[in-house]
């Protein structure tokens, strides 16, 4: 059978392994499996959100409000925007897909960091775009500028903070870079982990309204999957000027967000105390990781997210380490597919992190 020729160069995205898979493949009881692979919030979902979902469960026979009025209104009030500046997606990665289909076609150019969220490249290849990457692993804006001057770009992706490495650009450096970009180039600022970065360092905070007012060719993406603990509900959002939003809506299918997902997101926005408490605990536990990794003589990338990237250098092979941990019921993310001899570990609860340290010690002693 013939398929679109551009798919020959497309790799499928490798998601973090689910707990159910480990139970099936290794015969480990589900209560003994710890998942620290997908940057989910280990503290669960706000009790207020759970109560709202239970209340609305009886309405699942009805289609959702396709205008998404209440969620847009809540986001508009929180970020001082108009509802017309907002688009809602099934996760922020759906809005990434909208952006590429709205701006790119075969041989369009997309500029991104060498090591960043894999879906930028995958979605770009779906339309046959040319992918231009920096040579430096982390976001080097000087190199971005050089490549932009040389090749141009229809879209530039900036992941702030960056997944899967965890580093984060300063807001002022981002703004200086954006001043040099042509107004016909769409700049996607992926802020999936911005809540964490802004909590840790005010210099990393990007205000969505200021961003899109200052740079009308920019779109800011956020998600409810990380700090707001709604990974299973799949809700993301994009903020941009009306012209961008209107064109993205031409690609969106109706009813792309479920009734329960909309309600959960609205309720999650109300419980900032829960969110801030989770983020505070995250960075307290991250200190333990930094101390552990330093003591073991490994390298880590200072992280502004809810995960940490641990590099093994030439001492161990990350794929082997991740596999041995998996066999013991500990799921982490091997970064071999990103050409990194490293693992990415979600910062868990204290007891989960203690278990990770114990199992990692055991694995390393036997490799």
From Swiss-Prot:
Species of origin: Aliarcobacter butzleri (strain RM4018) (Arcobacter butzleri)
Gene Ontology process terms (BP): L-histidine biosynthetic process
This enzyme's EC code(s): 2.6.1.9
Known catalytic reactions: L-histidinol phosphate + 2-oxoglutarate = 3-(imidazol-4-yl)-2-oxopropyl phosphate + L-glutamate
The gene coding this protein: hisC
Protein name: Histidinol-phosphate aminotransferase
Modified-residue entries (N6-(pyridoxal phosphate)lysine), positions: 226
Highest rank taxon of the organism: Bacteria
Enzyme kind, highest EC tier: transferase
Source lineage: Bacteria, Pseudomonadati, Campylobacterota, Epsilonproteobacteria, Campylobacterales
Pathways per UniProt: Amino-acid biosynthesis; L-histidine biosynthesis; L-histidine from 5-phospho-alpha-D-ribose 1-diphosphate: step 7/9
């Amino acid at each position: 059978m013939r398929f679109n020729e551009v798919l020959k160069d497309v790799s499928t995205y490798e998601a973090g392994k689910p707990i159910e898979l480990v139970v099936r493949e290794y015969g480990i009881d589900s209560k003994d499996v710890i998942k620290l692979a997908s940057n989910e919030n280990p503290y669960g979902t706000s009790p207020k959100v759970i109560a709202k979902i239970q209340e609305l469960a009886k309405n699942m026979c009805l289609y959702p409000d396709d205008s998404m009025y209440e969620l847009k209104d809540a986001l508009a009030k929180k970020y001082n925007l108009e509802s017309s500046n907002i688009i809602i997606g099934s996760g922020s990665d759906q809005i990434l897909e909208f952006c590429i289909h709205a701006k790119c076609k075969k041989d369009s150019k997309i500029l991104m960091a060498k090591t960043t969220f894999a879906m930028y490249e995958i979605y770009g290849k779906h339309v046959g775009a040319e992918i231009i990457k920096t040579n430096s692993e982390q976001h080097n804006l000087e190199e971005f500028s050089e490549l932009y001057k040389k090749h141009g770009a229809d879209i530039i992706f900036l992941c702030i903070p960056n997944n899967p490495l965890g580093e984060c650009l300063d807001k002022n450096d981002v703004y200086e870079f954006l001043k040099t970009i042509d107004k016909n180039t769409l700049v996607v600022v992926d802020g999936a982990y911005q809540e964490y970065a802004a909590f840790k360092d005010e210099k990393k905070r990007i205000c969505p309204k200021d961003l899109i007012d200052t740079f009308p060719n920019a779109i800011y993406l956020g998600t409810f999957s990380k700090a707001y603990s709604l990974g299973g509900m799949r809700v993301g959002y994009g903020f941009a000027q009306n012209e961008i939003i209107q064109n993205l809506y031409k690609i969106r299918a109706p009813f792309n967000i479920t009734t329960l997902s909309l309600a959960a997101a609205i309720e999650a926005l109300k419980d900032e105390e829960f969110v801030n408490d989770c983020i505070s605990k995250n960075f307290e536990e991250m200190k333990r990781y930094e101390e552990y990794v330093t003591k073991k003589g490994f390298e880590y990338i200072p992280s502004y997210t809810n995960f940490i990237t641990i590099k093994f250098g030439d001492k161990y092979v990350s794929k082997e380490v991740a596999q041995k941990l998996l066999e013991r019921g500990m799921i982490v993310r091997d970064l071999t597919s990103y050409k990194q001899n490293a693992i990415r570990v979600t910062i868990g609860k204290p007891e989960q992190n203690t278990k990770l340290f114990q199992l990692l010690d055991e694995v390393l002693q036997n490799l």
